[in-house]
Amino acid sequence: MKRVVLLAALAATTVVAQSTQNRVLRVEGAPRGDLRSGPLTYTGNPVNATVSSLKLKAAQAVVSAPAGQTLAQAEGKRTGVFTGNVLVTRGRLTAKGEKLAYSEATGQGVLSGNPSATFVPEDKSNGDTVSISAGQMSLDVDNNVSTSTGSVRLTNGNQSGRAEKLIFDEDQELAQLTGNPTLTRAAKGNQKELTITGQEVRARTAEKTLYVRGGVRLVQGTLTTTGNAVYYDDKKNVAYVVGNAVSVDSKTKSRLASNILEQRTDIARVREVASFKIPTEQFNLRGEK
């Protein structure tokens, strides 16, 4: 038993050590400042730096150690502040802003100053670029996840979303919007604009599917459909409203109520269906089951 506990402890220690090493900031160039205790100031056109899979460029970078520690002693606890035309790249993600404050201790880089980001599809000939803007963006170097807060706007082809918070998983191409989220699918041809609201929106950006839950409301032309949750497939032009589903047409005064309603968004038609199970497992965030 002691051996098992010891092995588990060693494994945990190894994971922590690897995580700490992955968070170490590397800045290129010859800095100004106290080389032993810092802070060190780097300037260039631009300054280049890396941390884990993140590549950073900026007009200036300042690296500091906690008070009372040398830069060498503080490796894994230092901070780096990048200012002026900050550019961050990681795989298919590119983010921009005026300032990025990075902490080796947390592995978080916080981007501010009108931050924005784009995430290009793996197959550019068969997909749309995801664009994000917010008041602040936090990039996690331990995994390919970013968190945006404050007047968040996300666009993905003809879909656009607004919320107060967005978590975007680059590996899963999965977005979670909370804080009064609203999703809009732009009108196209005879297809009228569709607006979906609820307490939480999850979107698979490559597949163009949505899972919205918590007092959902779909508005399209004169049709308003409400329920507990909705699954929407943009490519198939169909939405399934599940749980206490009610659809009302303000023009014809018709009303349809059922446990499950299917709404064809291309022809604005609603009908009852006997069964439909939302594939919620497709929208699980990291660590969720």
What are these regions (language model features)?
Residues 2-7:
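Sec-dependent signal peptide recognition
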Residues 8-17:
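Hydrophobic h-region of N-terminal signal peptides that target proteins for export
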